[in-house]
Each structure stands twice: as C-alpha cells, then as structure tokens.
Amino acid sequence: MTKEQIIEAVKSMTVLELNDLVKAIEEEFGVTAAAPVAVAGGAGEAAAEKTEFDVELTSAGAQKIKVIKVVREITGLGLKEAKELVDNTPKVIKEAAAKEEAEEIKAKLEEVGAAVEVK
C-alpha cells in the first residue's frame, strides 16, 4: 500500500472512523496525537536583548586612590562622596547605562585594579 492509497483511504473515512484510527495508532506505537503545549510564559521577555545596564563596583582592589579618581571622573561626585562609595562596596556606580558606556566604565575601573560587575 502506497502513501497515496493510505491518504485516499483516510479521506473517505468519517470523523468517528478517524478518531478510532488515531486511537489505534496511539496504542500500537505508544505515542500521543496531542499537540505539544508551550510552558515558557516569561521566556519571551527574557529573550529580548537588555538595553540598560547597571555598573556595580564590587571591590576597590589595592589601588583605592586611583579607583576613587576614576569614580569621581565617571560620576562627577566630590572627593568625600567618591571615597565613601569606594569604601562601602559593593555599590552601583552608574545606573541604566547603555551597553557601550557600561563596558567603557568597567574597563576604566578594571584598569586601575577594581572589581566590577555589569548587571
């Protein structure tokens, strides 16, 4: 029996006969004819590319004075505020930065020995 003959036979069947055929095939081959259900509810949002990043200083490292200077340059803070920020790590240095800007800030801080995370 060819595929075409099987298709012609299926075309001539009633809905009840098709239902019986599907059940018989399921039993014979141990499969189900149910359509797979997608369970990924929030995955669509996670798949969208992130456009804003937070740059977090996790550790000042050994060259704290150089890190303070870079933090002042990036944030525009005064000496006292920048020192407090560096002393109380982990702290967010820049919020909602573009990807390129966040990477530049990270590179500047790592260059002077700081540990940085981009989130």
UniProtKB/Swiss-Prot annotation:
Keywords: Ribonucleoprotein, Ribosomal protein. GO terms for molecular function: mRNA binding; structural constituent of ribosome. Belongs to the bacterial ribosomal protein bL12 family. Homodimer. Part of the ribosomal stalk of the 50S ribosomal subunit. Forms a multimeric L10(L12)X complex, where L10 forms an elongated spine to which 2 to 4 L12 dimers bind in a sequential fashion. Binds GTP-bound translation factors. Forms part of the ribosomal stalk which helps the ribosome interact with GTP-bound translation factors. Is thus essential for accurate translation. It comes from the Bacteria. This is Large ribosomal subunit protein bL12.
